[in-house]
UniProtKB/Swiss-Prot annotation:
CDD domains: PulE-GspE-like. It comes from Pseudomonas aeruginosa (strain ATCC 15692 / DSM 22644 / CIP 104116 / JCM 14847 / LMG 12228 / 1C / PRS 101 / PAO1). This is Type II secretion system protein E. The lineage of its organism: Bacteria, Pseudomonadati, Pseudomonadota, Gammaproteobacteria, Pseudomonadales. The gene is xcpR. Changing residue 268 to S: Complete loss of extracellular alkaline phosphatase or phospholipase C activity. ATP binds at residues 263-270. Homodimer. Dimerization is directed by a relatively short domain near the extreme N-terminus and is essential for extracellular protein secretion. May form homooligomers. Interacts with XcpY/GspL. Forms an inner membrane platform subcomplex with XcpS/GspF, XcpY/GspL and XcpZ/GspM. InterPro entries: GSPE_N1E, P-loop_NTPase, T2SS/T4SS_dom, T2SS_E_N_sf, T2SS_GspE. It catalyses: ATP + H2O + cellular proteinSide 1 = ADP + phosphate + cellular proteinSide 2.
């Protein structure tokens, strides 16, 4: 091909849809507008197949304009210069590690990037967001579109915080790419959608649950990160006191009965159930679950997922499971009377049933089941115990700062202010990303039902009476929090934050 000097590139009044940058650079092809005429510029030794693909992309045949190597590179840079040269370097250098905010600033504002499947800056940005979230042990990533801005927030250790504010124009690109990764319908923006992404990051398998929601300013996306390693925990990893761990271990090894775990959303109930199942999973038991959704896949355990579209409810799944000769049954949540009745009957016919309830206290679970319509005499016969729990942030061991408790703190902790204990406060360092906390642990109230508690339930005693008896046999959830404060694991503020109703 003959080469021509670099022409003056005039920005067209209505620029055509450009070739994706990676294709243009790799194949040596570029759309140019010269004197109101569109050309397909090409560097030496370009492949005919690439020319044909570019013509197809343009939707019409464009005349060819041959350029030398240097001239082509200058034209390429000039054509994409408003994307910034940093963004072009970004598309090439896939292996580089870049600052998240800088990465967001470098992403070009062009829908053409969606044509790329492997090295688009928008994909690099999403990968960087996911990688940073996993490094910080975030449980959720929020992409929130407002009228004039786009915000990315992480929920780390139960607390939501803003980490990035990309250009508002990137909202549609980010949402579309996430939808592609989660195999959702990218054209459907009027209704909520749910999907799933599986990744391997740094040797760790991570599942991501994706939820989209239409809003006034565009779709909002929340990604729930599920670390598959968390499904391999056992009871020793949950931060229980020695007393609670031993009692819990004894309780889950009972041949039949119901054990409930209670607490608000995000308090670690599912993790506790999985740890209990892992403890029991010794190949001598048939363990089956019905969940919504399956958060972690457990080897050697049969797991079934609720599917409302085909009327596969907790109750229906539980009925089916009971025909599969189970020893242990885990029901993700008891939401209605039907599920509760089946669970109680299963426990009375020789099965161990584990499940969760959304109540604030351990004894509150009994009241909730009675309110659902379960007869107290059935509960008194079937219930083994209830574990109430919350999650508190753990102080960063590298920077936590000791200090003497003041009078108010001594009163909260139930200690003599004349001899104030040494407590610790959050400070912040590089190890914990300046947050002062690293990770979370549970605080618990385990009520194992004895004969007296069963008689109280059978006689329909008040919740206050049952609570008073529970306090005689073990600490409350706030008592367990106080213990962790005195041990330097967490702070008074954290315990108060999660136990305000106590």
């Amino acid at each position: 091909m003959m080469t021509a000097p670099l022409p003056d590139i005039a920005a067209p009044a209505a620029p055509p849809r450009r070739l994706p940058f990676s294709f243009a650079k790799r194949q040596g092809l570029l759309f140019l507008c010269l004197e109101e005429q569109y050309w397909l510029a090409c560097r030496p030794q370009v492949e005919l197949a690439a020319i044909a693909e570019a013509q197809r992309f343009a939707g019409r045949r464009l005349p060819l304009k041959a350029l030398g190597e240097d001239a082509f590179n200058q034209a390429l840079a000039a054509s994409y210069q408003h994307d910034s040269s940093a963004a072009m370097q970004l598309a090439e250098d896939l292996g580089g590690s870049l600052d998240l905010a800088a990465l967001a600033d470098q992403v070009p504002e062009t829908e053409d990037l969606m044509e790329q499947e492997d090295d688009a800056p928008i994909i690099r940005l999403i990968n960087a967001i996911l990688g940073e979230a996993i490094r910080e042990n975030a449980s959720d990533i929020h992409l929130e579109t407002f009228e004039k801005r786009l915000v990315v927030r992480f929920r780390v250790d139960g607390v939501l915080r803003e980490v990035l504010e990309p250009k508002r124009e990137l909202a549609a690109l980010l949402v579309s790419r996430i939808k592609v990764m989660a195999r959702l319908d990218i054209a459907e923006k009027r209704i909520p959608q749910d999907g799933r992404i599986s990744l391997r990051v740094g040797g760790r398998e991570v599942d991501i649950r994706v939820s989209t929601l239409p809003s006034a300013n565009g779709e909002r996306v929340v990604l729930r990160l599920l670390d598959k390693q968390a499904g391999r925990l056992n009871l020793q990893h949950l931060g229980m006191s020695e007393r609670d761990r031993k009692l819990m271990d004894e309780t889950v090894r009972k041949p039949h009965g119901i054990l409930l775990v209670t607490g608000p959303t995000g308090s670690g109930k599912t993790t506790t159930l999985y740890a209990s199942l892992t403890t029991l999973n010794d190949r001598t038991r048939n363990i089956l679950t019905v969940e919504d959704p399956i958060e972690y896949h457990l080897e050697g355990i049969g797991q079934t997922q609720v599917n409302a579209k085909v009327d596969m409810t907790f109750a229906r799944g539980l009925r089916a499971i009971l025909r599969q000769d189970p020893d242990v049954v885990m029901v993700g949540e008891i939401r209605d009377r039907e599920t509760a009745e089946i669970a109680v009957q299963a426990s009375l016919t020789g099965h161990l049933v584990l499940s969760t309830l959304h109540t604030n206290s351990a004894i509150g679970a009994i009241t909730r089941l009675v309110d659902m319509g379960i007869e107290p005499f059935l509960l008194s016969s079937s219930m083994l115990g209830v574990l109430a729990q919350r999650l508190v942030r753990v102080l960063c061991p590298a920077c936590k700062e000791p200090y003497r408790a003041d009078e108010a703190e001594c009163a909260l902790l139930g200690v003599d202010p004349a001899a104030p204990p040494t407590l610790h406060r959050a400070r912040g360092c590089g190890e914990c990303h300046q947050h002062g906390y690293r990770g979370r642990t549970g605080i618990y109230e385990l009520v194992v039902f004895d004969d007296h508690m069963r008689s109280l339930i059978h006689n329909e005693s008040s919740e206050q009476e049952m609570t008073r008896h529970a306090r005689t046999s073990g600490p409350s959830i706030r008592d367990d929090g106080r213990r962790k404060v005195l041990e330097g694991v967490t702070t008074v503020e954290e315990v108060l934050r999660v136990t305000r109703e106590e």
